[in-house]
UniProtKB/Swiss-Prot annotation:
GO molecular-function terms, A-Z: undecaprenyl-diphosphatase activity
PANTHER family: UNDECAPRENYL-DIPHOSPHATASE (PTHR30622:SF3)
EC number(s) per entry: 3.6.1.27
Keyword vocabulary terms for this entry: Antibiotic resistance, Cell membrane, Cell shape, Cell wall biogenesis/degradation, Hydrolase, Membrane, Peptidoglycan synthesis, Transmembrane, Transmembrane helix
Protein name in UniProt: Undecaprenyl-diphosphatase
Compartment list: Cell membrane
Keyword Nucleotide-binding: no
EC class of the enzyme, as a word: hydrolase
One Pfam family in the UniProt entry: BacA
Topology in membrane: Multi-pass membrane protein
Underlying gene: uppP
Purpose: Catalyzes the dephosphorylation of undecaprenyl diphosphate (UPP). Confers resistance to bacitracin.
Misc note: Bacitracin is thought to be involved in the inhibition of peptidoglycan synthesis by sequestering undecaprenyl diphosphate, thereby reducing the pool of lipid carrier available.
């Protein structure tokens, strides 16, 4: 009977991992904050695992979502793709150089502030404030953007300086509730790129950023003396695979969506969610 109960509990853990993977796959690419959603979802659907594992899980799971970008854009991102002309190969290498340049600010500040941010800012109130602030920012920027023609409508024409500026906006995403994609897309629009260019560059920028951040979290996890059981590895794998599959659909949806729409609806969603998170955090603080 005990074995049956343990098996049932483990199956429930795997189902939770599937749900968390779905949340990650949706929220990683839409500018609505994957970390903010995972913090909220974990309150109601918490894995029966150690805090250290959950903290690592919430970050390393991003690799599944990032892998979806590599699959969808493989030909475009691969400088060794058969059939590419010398000009196309050159543009691909230049694209990667822009991505590397854009990663520099977040790599520096991420390493410097990661532990402090996790200790002091991973709470409901910070997440709620960031959701609302960036929600308002999206609505305001999109309203202003209707009267301004983008200066950069082709990623190949984006300068290295513009890439660096977008990288500076990515630094803001180390604050929980901001949204990495939200910060970089908003930054791209502010510095003069079209929505599609900002979204594309956001996807590409996520590859080294999230691989690096996930690697850092995994290393810290093991340095702190933690181990990874077979059951935990399976939970992480299930969530990552789910995030990968969902991301394949979400990325394509977003790229089709922004051809005819702006990001205002996501701004409104962030404001509503931020108010809900703030209310929940206040209730939890008062009543425990």
């Amino acid at each position: 009977m005990e074995i049956i109960m343990q098996t049932a509990q483990y199956i429930i853990e795997l189902l939770k991992a599937v749900f968390l993977g779905i949340v990650e796959g949706i929220t990683e690419w839409l500018p609505i904050s994957s970390t903010g959603h995972l913090i909220l979802v974990n309150e109601f659907l918490n894995l029966r695992q150690s805090k250290d594992f959950i903290d690592m899980f919430n970050i390393v799971m991003h690799l599944g979502a990032i892998l979806a970008v590599m699959v969808i854009y493989f030909k475009r991102l691969n400088p060794f793709q058969p059939g590419k002309t010398a000009r196309e190969v050159q543009l691909t290498w230049k694209l990667w150089l822009k991505v590397v340049i854009a990663c520099i600010p977040s790599a520096f500040f991420g390493l410097l502030l990661d532990d402090w941010m996790e200790a002091h800012l991973s709470n409901f109130f910070v997440v709620a404030i960031m959701l609302v602030v960036y929600g308002i920012a999206f609505i305001w920027i999109e309203d202003r953007n209707r009267r301004v023609d983008p200066k950069v409508t082709d990623l190949a024409r984006m300068s290295y300086k513009t890439a660096f500026y977008i990288g500076l906006f990515q630094v803001l995403s180390i604050i929980p509730g901001t949204s990495r994609s939200g910060a970089t897309i908003l930054g791209g629009i502010i510095v003069g790129t079209s929505r599609s260019v900002a979204a594309d560059f956001t996807f590409f920028l996520g590859i080294p950023t999230m691989f690096g951040y996930s690697g850092l979290k995994a290393v810290k996890y093991f340095i702190d003396g933690n181990t990874l059981t077979g059951g935990q590895a399976a939970i992480l794998l299930v969530a990552s695979v789910t995030a990968f599959l969902v991301s394949l659909f979400v990325i394509r949806f977003l790229m089709n969506y922004i051809k005819k729409h702006d990001f205002t609806v996501f701004g409104k969603y962030r404001i509503v969610l931020g108010i809900i998170v703030l209310f929940y955090g206040a209730v939890k603080l008062i009543f425990g």
